[in-house]
Amino acid sequence: MKASIYLVTVFILLLLLLPTAIPHDYSDALRKSILFFEGQRSGRLPKQQRMAWRRNSALNDGKNLKTDLVGGYYDAGDNVKFHFPMAFTATMLAWSSVDFGRYMSQHDFRHNLVAVKWATDYLLKTVSQLPNRIFVHVGEVQPDHDCWERPEDMDTPRTAFALDAPYPASDLAGEIAAALAAASIAFKQANPKYSAILLNKAVQTFQYADSHRGSYTDNPGIKQAVCPFYCSVNGYKDELLWGAAWLRRATGEDSYLRYLVDNGQAFGESSNYFEFGWDNKVGGVNVLVAKEVLQNNVTAIAAYKDTAEKMMCSFLPETNGPHMSYTPGGLIYKPGSTQLQNTAALSFLLLTYADYLSTSSQQLNCGNLKFQPDSLRRIVKRQVDYVLGDNPMKLSYMIGYGERYPGLIHHRGSSIPSVTVHPAAFGCIAGWNIFSSPNPNPNILIGAVIGGPDVDDRFIGGRTNASETEPTTYINAPFVGVFAYFKSNPNFS
């Protein structure tokens, strides 16, 4: 008897000594991923501002063109406002509300709509002079990057750039149309009047995009101002499909369905379909359009669903190639950009397609193999947990989440003492002394998901390593919907 008790005791002690995975708090991650956007705000901040170390900035934007371009978001760790990636950010935040809002608490859903509206209020300004003019971005990149200044102090030129008709801007206008259309769905119940304004302007903006075909960076002046940061490398045709797809979903009108049918092949819905991000919308177009095929059997656009299926199958190693690549630690890997930018956008598509399969009671068909929607969700779960700390570096790549996350991130406002504790301005050159400091950023940019590790799961860090430590709005935005799903399904495995 004593021997049996002894063995049981030893067994229990051994179990206690075994390493156990600490479950992640997806609710906390969701809340913080939305809060991050308050740290990126430009313009006059509201009384409800929760990221308290930020203050008003860039209150004269647009003045050189005699227009109001105050507001919007800084795209990353600098103080420039690029409208192309900002519009993509708005689209993804709105899509998170539309398809994953049911997984959010009322509190989180409301704050996500606030984040969407901060972007769309500004985007409405960028297309306020259509069909004659569209505003492209605000701030001169080189002078801005030559200085290390918090937004509240910046004294670099705030030149606003615009394109006048007939110069083309199909990619920029197409993405803005998509953002406004997606947001119109998100606000349909909460604010019907605002929803109608967004949809009306989305229709007008898409008409402009389709009437003046070409990329916004085809213009030499804009190319010099924007490139190499946000050049439209992939061209404009994917944004036309993207805008049409969102307008089809927002309106249900057959004219947008015909547009997708007539232009899908010519505009490349079946090419380069492994990509999705601020520049290339092909993967997103196919998944978004596939919803109607899966749920309503709209066979006229079945080609989009077939291409979306090819993309989904590429994530599963059991299928015939081609395949997506993964790091040794399990992170989705694509060469040529910050890794978590790809992880965020592709994870969102995987989870969204899984949702469309589930609601239509269908499986993923990969040749002779069939997969349940949960096969895709497991891939996403691995990505999310990796980002939150289950990775070879044992490091959370979300700032302010968990016990261990990078302290020196490439972000001007976060790295320089706040005006609340140091009212005197930091000049252009003085800021570089702070940039070189080994001390952690004094202002925690809560919820920011940074660039992340390399192909071998290594992370060096430091403010000088912008590809690893700089956050962007378009990394965070897709993660909002992803975190919302796992908040409501925390025990999924």
Curated annotation (Swiss-Prot):
Keywords: Carbohydrate metabolism, Cell wall biogenesis/degradation, Cellulose degradation, Glycoprotein, Glycosidase, Hydrolase, Polysaccharide degradation, Secreted, Signal
Entry GO terms, CC: extracellular region
Main location: secreted
Protein's GO biological process: cell wall organization; cellulose catabolic process
Residue positions of the active site: 78 (nucleophile), 410, 470
Localization in the cell: Secreted
EC number: 3.2.1.4
InterPro entries (UniProt xref): 6-hairpin_glycosidase_sf, 6hp_glycosidase-like_sf, Glyco_hydro_9, Glyco_hydro_9_His_AS
Reaction it catalyzes: Endohydrolysis of (1->4)-beta-D-glucosidic linkages in cellulose, lichenin and cereal beta-D-glucans
Cleaved signal peptide residues: 1-23
Molecular function per GO: cellulase activity
Protein origin, superkingdom: Eukaryota
Glycosylation sites: 297, 465
Assigned protein family: Belongs to the glycosyl hydrolase 9 (cellulase E) family.
Protein's recorded name: Endoglucanase 23
Organism: Arabidopsis thaliana (Mouse-ear cress)
Phylogenetic placement of the source organism: Eukaryota, Viridiplantae, Streptophyta, Embryophyta, Tracheophyta
